[in-house]
Amino acid sequence: MTEKHLSSQFDSELNGVSSRVMELGGMVESQIHTAVYALLQFDPEAADRVMETENRVNAMEIDIDRELSSIIARRQPTARDLRLLIAISKTTANLERVGDEANKIARMVKSIIESGSARALPSNELRIAADLASGLLRTALDAFARLDTAAALSILKDDDLIDKEFDGFVRKLVTYMMEDPRTISASLDLLFLAKAIERIGDHAKNIAEFIIYIVKGADVRHTSMQEIESALK
């Protein structure tokens, strides 16, 4: 993931912590897939599996942060390496938050099932947005492993697709509630789920921004697409 250093031990430490981040990413990806399955099938057992993973995700985030703090204290990294370590820490935090969103989905699925209105809701309408969010996270993790700024730029552009899907779903859900007011409570739960999916895409976008920060040293948060493309030249 990184260029070679004079200290092979430093290289080993950087690669080790980067591998842990990818392991965390894989764990969180699995949470998302299971949470979406639980949503589409209204499967309470799948929702339970998502929630059972939460403690492992949280523990791994803490372990990675401890290792990063130790590396910084012992190695006194150069500017580029410090950017990498900071970005790894922020990426880890974003992955943990993706896990939080997966858990929110799982808990809400359980609530909807218990309300007895599960099958009456158009949950399948969320499939496209969920697939987009999951795909963006996978691309972000792959780009992070390769420090691929071109892939990072593609993620930043594609994030708008999830936002459009979310907006379209909200319009459909409002219409659905107006046609059948009895489903308002459960429909609001589904709206909460849609927002959780949108946030997963936002976290993938954040990771893409960290990649650009590592490679180019440019903080592209809250900047226009034109400014981002200029920073990558």
Locate the predicted segments by residue.
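Cytosolic, long alpha-helical scaffolding segments
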Residues: 1-233
